[in-house]
Amino acid sequence: MNENLFASFITPTLMGLPIVLLIIMFPNLLFPSPTRLMNNRLVSFQQWLIQLVLKQMMAMHNPKGRTWSLMLISLIMFIGSTNLLGLLPHSFTPTTQLSMNLGMAIPLWAGAVITGFRHKTKASLAHFLPQGTPIPLIPMLIIIETISLFIQPMALAVRLTANITAGHLLMHLIGGATLVLTSISPPTAILTFIILVLLTMLEFAVALIQAYVFTLLVSLYLHDNT
């Protein structure tokens, strides 16, 4: 148990070179483009799931917002697949890195905000001052709304990082406790192993839910600006 608790969150290297780019590109292999007239069950299930998520996410958008459909579905597939790959033993989860999550959140948020200021300038500026605000509170509310606008990408990135990191740390701690208790108290080790299995199943759900939540919030920001 001399391994650092946060060792699994350190970017892996190969011959001194970071291999995070290979890890990030690996999910592309999980979603192959169909090359046959008749798809197999896996590809058919993937296409059905993608269409279902896309239909729910694009239902609230106007035609201008629906032009982002390819971007949003690619985002949810990328985050979901990287989260699931991170659950494999001795693997690395890129979404535990706040820098990477900020790299996804800031451009998407900025694109949505710029779209709003470009096509709906008056409506976008009206968000900074709610209707019916007393005159003495106008400067304070403008400052508060401006801060809340710029904190949105940080909230997106921190939420994803915290949820994925917390789950991985719990799995690491319970897994280590199971190994230690195997020689000390086998009945207790069996109990902790059952808890570890249940937690792993929960983490599979969290990996997909967090991908959906991240993409849904980006979609909501886009909806407010289109």
Curated annotation (Swiss-Prot):
Any one annotated GO CC term: proton-transporting ATP synthase complex
Transmembrane segments: 6-26, 68-88, 97-117, 138-158, 164-184, 189-209
Molecular-function GO terms, alphabetical: proton channel activity; proton-transporting ATP synthase activity, rotational mechanism
PROSITE patterns: ATPASE_A
Transferase is among the record's keywords: no
Main location: mitochondrion
Keyword Transmembrane: yes
Subcellular localization(s) per the UniProt record: Mitochondrion inner membrane
Record-linked InterPro entries: ATP_synth_F0_asu, ATP_synth_F0_asu_AS, ATP_synth_F0_asu_bact/mt, F0_ATP_A_sf
Keywords linked to the UniProt accession: ATP synthesis, CF(0), Hydrogen ion transport, Ion transport, Membrane, Mitochondrion, Mitochondrion inner membrane, Transmembrane, Transmembrane helix, Transport
Annotated Pfam families: ATP-synt_A
Function: Subunit a, of the mitochondrial membrane ATP synthase complex (F(1)F(0) ATP synthase or Complex V) that produces ATP from ADP in the presence of a proton gradient across the membrane which is generated by electron transport complexes of the respiratory chain. ATP synthase complex consist of a soluble F(1) head domain - the catalytic core - and a membrane F(1) domain - the membrane proton channel. These two domains are linked by a central stalk rotating inside the F(1) region and a stationary peripheral stalk.
UniProt name for this protein: ATP synthase F(0) complex subunit a
